[in-house]
Structures are given as structure tokens and as C-alpha cells.
């Protein structure tokens, strides 16, 4: 079984916990679904096909933090765009279209990912992309 080992890092990251819709908090590390999404973006697989193309049922993922996990909260202004605004997103009189929501982010996250058990063609494609430093889609944390 071939294992791919590579680092991912960024200025900020957020891996939203699904049970926190009103005040989004983040996992301290990328969950397996996020790692599979990153792999799909690197390899260039569409979001509707990457699970099957990678072989997610047999995938084995390990994550090792390479920097201390530092979290912070920031209030984000959300703008309601369905009702109450015109086509230029200007609020109509008497209607509040902004909502401030505190989001939790990770500051300067850095992780080493260990990935094994992928389909052979997907492993070869990922290894080639990683070795050349290219991605098909932009990877975000």
C-alpha cells in the first residue's frame, strides 16, 4: 500500500462543525471529509465524483499538527441577499439586512497529512501533482 505524505498550511483555516450553525466553531484539525476534498481539488476531480475516484471507502488518513493549534473568534457581517435589498445589495429603508455572527478560525494552521489506501490511478495522479507543486483547483483551509 503506497502512502502519500505532504504538508498543508495557510494563514487561516476553518473546519466547521456541522452542529454549530449559528456560531460556527472549527475542528482543531481537518476532518477526513475535508482531507478528501483537498485531495480531490489537487487531483482535479469534480465535487460530485471525487469520493468514488479516490476510493474513499478504503482510504486511510493520518493528520499530524506541525504547529500549535491557535484559534480565535472574529465577528463576520453577513448580508441577507434574498429579501430586503435591491440588485446592488443596498438595504431598503426600515429593514435590517445585516447580521453579525462570531466565527471561530484557526490562525496559521499547518498539518502533515498521511494518506494511504487510495485507488492506484488516483494515488499516481496525486503524487504527480504534489511533486510538481500544482493543483487543479485552489485548495483552501
Regions found by a protein language model. Name each.
Residues 2, 18-89:
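Glycine/small-residue-rich interface belts in oligomeric ring/scaffold proteins
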Residues 3-8:
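Short amphipathic
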Residues 11, 25, 102:
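Glycine-rich, flexible loop/turn motifs
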Residues 11-12, 46-48, 96-98:
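Short secondary-structure boundary micro-motifs
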Residues 12, 60-62, 110-112:
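Structural motif
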Residues 12-18:
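Short N-terminal binding/cap micro-motifs at the start of the first secondary-structure element
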Residues 66-141:
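Internal, well-folded beta-alpha domain core
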Amino acid at each position: 500500500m503506497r502512502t502519500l505524505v505532504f504538508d498543508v498550511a495557510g494563514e487561516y483555516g476553518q473546519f466547521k462543525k456541522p452542529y454549530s450553525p449559528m456560531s460556527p466553531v472549527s475542528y482543531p484539525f481537518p476532518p477526513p471529509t475535508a482531507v478528501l476534498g483537498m485531495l480531490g481539488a489537487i487531483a482535479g476531480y469534480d465535487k460530485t465524483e471525487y469520493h468514488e475516484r479516490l476510493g474513499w471507502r478504503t482510504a486511510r488518513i493520518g493528520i499530524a499538527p506541525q504547529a500549535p493549534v491557535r484559534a480565535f473568534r472574529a465577528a463576520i457581517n453577513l448580508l441577507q441577499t434574498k429579501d430586503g435589498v435591491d440588485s446592488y445589495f443596498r438595504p431598503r429603508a426600515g429593514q435590517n439586512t445585516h447580521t453579525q455572527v462570531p466565527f471561530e478560525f484557526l490562525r496559521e494552521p499547518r498539518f502533515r497529512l498521511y494518506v494511504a489506501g487510495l485507488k492506484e490511478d488516483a494515488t499516481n495522479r496525486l503524487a504527480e501533482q504534489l511533486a510538481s507543486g500544482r493543483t487543479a483547483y485552489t485548495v483552501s483551509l
